Amino acid sequence: MTIHNHTLGFPRVGLRRELKKAQESYWAGKSTREELLAVGRELRARHWEQQKAAGIDLLPVGDFAWYDHVLTTSLLLGNVPARHQNADGTVDIDTLFRIGRGRAPTGEPAAAAEMTKWFNTNYHYMVPEFTKGQQFSLTWTQLLDEVDEALALGHHVKPVLLGPVTYLWLGKVKGEQFDRLSLLNDILPVYQQVIAELAKRGIQWVQIDEPALVLELPQAWLDAFKPAYEALKGQTKLLLTTYFEGVSDNLDTITALPVQGLHVDLVHGHDDVNELHRRLPQEWLLSAGVINGRNVWRADLTEKYAQLKAIAGQRELWVGSSCSLLHSPIDLSVETRLDAEVKSWFAFALQKCEELALLRDALNSGDTTKIEQWSAPIQARKHSARVHNPAVEQRLKAITPQDSQRAHAYPVRAEAQRARFNLPAWPTTTIGSFPQTTEIRGLRLDFKKGNLDAANYRTGIAEHIKQAIAEQERLGLDVLVHGEAERNDMVEYFGEHLDGFVFTQNGWVQSYGSRCVKPPVVIGDISRPAPITVEWAKYAQSLTDKPVKGMLTGPVTILCWSFPREDVSRETIAKQIALALRDEVADLEAAGIGIIQIDEPALREGLPLKRSDWDAYLAWGVEAFRLNAAVAKDDTQIHTHMCYCEFNDIMDSIAALDADVITIETSRSDMELLESFEEFEYPNEIGPGVYDIHSPNVPDVAWIEALLKKAAQRIPQERLWVNPDCGLKTRGWPETRAALANMVKAAQNLRQA
C-alpha cells in the first residue's frame, strides 16, 4: 500500500500579509470588493501551487477564510445573528465582516460577535450564537466555489469542513436558555447537502474536523457523534480529524462511527500509534499527524520514520501535519537575518510540507538517506552552546521552596505597604500602557531601521515618558505608570532583552481577522544579561513624588505567547524566565520602585485541554509567578493584571499567586466576575476594571460610581482599587484623558460620600 501525505490546512495571510492589507484597505473604503476577492483568489492559487511543488499529494480546500473558519462555517449554515443580517435576507462578505468586526463597508453597524481562543492556541475564533427554534440553510457557498477553483486548476483536493458536533460545542446560546446540542438535527441537513455537492464534483475524501473529540466531553455530547455521522455517511469518504491532543480516552466512541479514516495528532497527544493501529477498524485509513503544525522547529524525521515504520504497509496510511499549518509562519527561506546555525533548526509551513514529502518517500522506499541528512542539524543542536547555559541549568536545580515564598503573609505586608505609600481610599491607577501615538511608533521604527541614533532615540522616549507622567499628575491619579513608550509588544520587548530568544523578520501568524502576531522563538536556556526596565522606571519615578509602577510581563505569558523549545518542558522554560525576571524585580526595588506589576494575562489560556491535566499545569504556573515575585520585600507591593471572563474554576490558583493587588477585567460583565472573588473570600486587594478600554466610548462619572458601589457590596471597600479594564495603548489621547478624568472624579466622589 502506497503511503500518501497531506496537510490539514495552510496559512491564509500570505507571505507579506497580503490578506491583512487587502482586508484593511477594503474596510477603509480604499479598494473595492472585487479587488479584495481577487487577492483571495491569488493567495489560494499560490498556496495550492506552493504545497504541490513542495510535494503534497492531497491539497486542503476550505482552510482559507476571510476572517475566521468558524465564522465561515456559521455563514455556510445560514447562522447569522439578526443584528448582522442584510435587509433583503441575503448573505455576502460584508455580513461576515459585520459579525467579525461589528461593521463593514455596507449595512448598519452592530455589536460584533464574541471572540475567544481556538482551543489552546493563540488563534481566536468568532463564537457562533444560537437561539431557540433557529432555522439553518445553505446560504454561503464559499467552500464549494473554492473546490471548483482548485479543480479548475487541476489540483487533487481534500475539502475541509468543521464538523457539526464541534461547531455546536464552540457556540453559545443567546436569549432564552436551551440545550444547543438539540440543534444537531437542524444543522445536519445542511452538512448532507454540502457533502452531496462535493460528491457530485468527484471528491473522494472530505476532511471533517472534530477537535472536540480530544476533550473530556459530557456523555451526551459523546453520544451525539453516532447519529450525526450516521446521517452524513455514504456519499464520500470521511476523514474524521482531531488535533491538539490525543484521542485514546474517546476511542471507543470514535471506532463506532461510520467514517473511513481518522486523523490523530501524534505530536501533542500521547497516543501510541501501534495501539491505534490495533484498535481502529482494519479497513480505516489512519492519518498520522507527526509534523508539528504549531511550532517552528525542524522535525527529526528519523524519529518519525521509526515511529511509523512498523505499521507502514499494514493498513492504509497517510502522513500529515499535526493540525492546520495556520499556526506556523509561511516560509523560512525569506528569513535573511537569522544566522545559518539557528536557521538550520527551523521549518516553517512550506518546509513542513517538504518534511512530509521526505517522510512519505522514505516510508515508501525504505531509503532513509535523505531524512538522515534532514535530521542532522537536530543532532547538532543538542550540543550547541546557543542552547545550553550551564549557569542557568545550575540555578534551576538550586531552587528551594523558600524561593517562592514572600517573607511574610499578606496581612503583614499590607501594613508595611500602607505605611510606605499612604494612599487614599479608592486608590486610582492604570494598567500600564498609554496611547501608542504615530510619533512614538515612528520613533521606534526610525531607531530600528538605523535612521536615528541611540542618543536621540532615548531623548525622544524620555520626552514621551515625561508627558505621560505630567498627564497623570494633571488627572490626579494616585499610582502612576511610565506609559511603555519604548515597548512595541509586551512579550517581544522582554524577549529582545533576554538571552535564549531569537526573532524572525516575517514569522507572522494570524491571531484573528486581520491581526497577525510575530512570536519570539525560545531557542535556548533563558537568562537576563542586564536590567531591562529599570532605567526608564527610575527616570519616571524621578519626575514625581507619587509612586510609579514597574511593569513586567509574567513568565507564563511570555512562554504562552512565544514559540517554545521542544527539547525541554514548558515548566522548565517558565521557571527560567521567572528566575531572569526575579532579578529584574530585585533591581527595580533597589532603584527605589516600590510597586511592581507582573502581568499574567495568559495564565488561564495556557490551561491544558483535558481538565485532568489542569492541576499539574497550575501548580508550576503559580510557582513560576511566585518565583518571579517572592524576592520583593514586605513593603514592596506586587500587582498582577489578568483579563479573563471566568475565574470560578481557577480561584484557588489565583489566590495562590499571592499578589498584593490583582486588577481584572470586569466592566463588560457589570462586576459579575467579582462573585467568584466574593464566594472564595479572596484575601488580598482587587482592582475591578471600571470601563472597557476596547471601546472609544467615554464612561460617565455616575456610571463608574455605580459600578464601584456594586463592587463594594462584594469586596470590602478598603481592599478595592479603581482602574480601567486593560492597558490604553490602542486608544487615542482625547478619549483616554476624558475617561480617566471621569474615573478619578468618581473615586473622589466616593471618598467624600
From Swiss-Prot:
Residues the record lists as binding Zn(2+): H641, C643, E665, C726
Would I find ATP-binding among this entry's keywords? no
Q: What does this protein do?
A: Catalyzes the transfer of a methyl group from 5-methyltetrahydrofolate to homocysteine resulting in methionine formation.
Pathway involvement?
Amino-acid biosynthesis; L-methionine biosynthesis via de novo pathway; L-methionine from L-homocysteine (MetE route): step 1/1
Entries under SUPFAM superfamilies matching the protein = UROD/MetE-like
Residue sites binding 5-methyltetrahydropteroyltri-L-glutamate per the record: R17, E18, L19, K20, K117, R515, C516, W561, E605
* Cofactor binding comment, as recorded: Binds 1 zinc ion per subunit.
Annotated residues for binding of L-homocysteine? I431, G432, S433, E484, D599
* Gene Ontology molecular functions: 5-methyltetrahydropteroyltriglutamate-homocysteine S-methyltransferase activity; zinc ion binding
Q: Which Pfam families match?
A: Meth_synt_1, Meth_synt_2
Query: Its Enzyme Commission number?
Result: 2.1.1.14
**Cofactor(s) recorded in Swiss-Prot or TrEMBL:** Zn(2+)
- Name by which UniProt lists this protein: 5-methyltetrahydropteroyltriglutamate--homocysteine methyltransferase
Q: What class of enzyme is it?
A: transferase
Q: Which keywords does this chain's UniProt record carry?
A: Amino-acid biosynthesis, Metal-binding, Methionine biosynthesis, Methyltransferase, Repeat, Transferase, Zinc
Stated family: Belongs to the vitamin-B12 independent methionine synthase family.
Positions of the catalytic residues = H694 (proton donor)
Gene Ontology biological process terms from the UniProt entry: methionine biosynthetic process; methylation
